[in-house]
Amino acid sequence: SNFSRENSLAMYHQSFKDMQVEYFDYYLLHAIGGGGMKVFNERYIDNGMLDFLLKEREAGRIRHLGWSFHGDVEVFDQVLAMHDTVKWDFVQIQLNYVDWRHATGNNVNAEYLYGELAKRNIAAVIMEPLLGGRLSNVPEHIVGRLKQRRPEDSVASWAFRFAGSPELVLT
């Protein structure tokens, strides 16, 4: 991709036209973590875009500035460490009752991610509360245990309730 300042500014300004708005309530830097800090720096630092977006927030055209995390926990930690100067308003993380402590593959335990956000009082936006739908279709022995406690509740409602329960989750 071309991360030039010109392309990035054009995309930003086109978003206002496409959405037919004068400001964004939440402006998210998407897919931070893939490609390491090299890609983050190319997309937002080297071309001055992060500084530009911070000025846009000051001007009121962005009300809340944040990013979505996908991948490398070292990048998560480094971008989060920028909070002292950037003052991130929110971060989107994968959070569900399986990934809380038992994340697999490229995922990172949500307990760690959320804990780091909480230390800095940064709001969390949740993705994958149903883990791609898998938490709405669990084995029957688990369904039975859930229904013993709350017979009227759907299996999916347990996952949504878990994901929406932490104090700093935006709901």
Predicted regions and their residues:
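Beta/alpha (TIM)-barrel catalytic core signal, keyed to glycine-rich beta->alpha loops juxtaposed to Asp/Glu
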Residues: 31-171
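Structural motif corresponding to the early beta-alpha repeats
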Residues: 1-9, 30-33
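Short linear sequence motifs
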Residues: 5, 16-19, 151, 155
